[in-house]
């Protein structure tokens, strides 16, 4: 399935509520900062237990439109990586005209 701006995907939100923000990670190989995103709520929930979260912080899976996520991510120097329920990267989404490595 092709993702477009109105496709609903799922992300992990840190500190849900007034100070919430998307949960981000850094790719160990490329040192690229990215927001992990998922095609299903179940995949996001399954993967959350495997991610390096901070003790004392709250995390919540939320739906977001793909276009809103990529605009926010790219505007804050993050990329978007699609993950499966086991945390494997299935797709790397870089901003248009990015010099980022595509491997």
What is each of the regions a protein language model found here?
Residues 1-103:
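Conserved NAD+-utilizing ADP-ribose enzyme module
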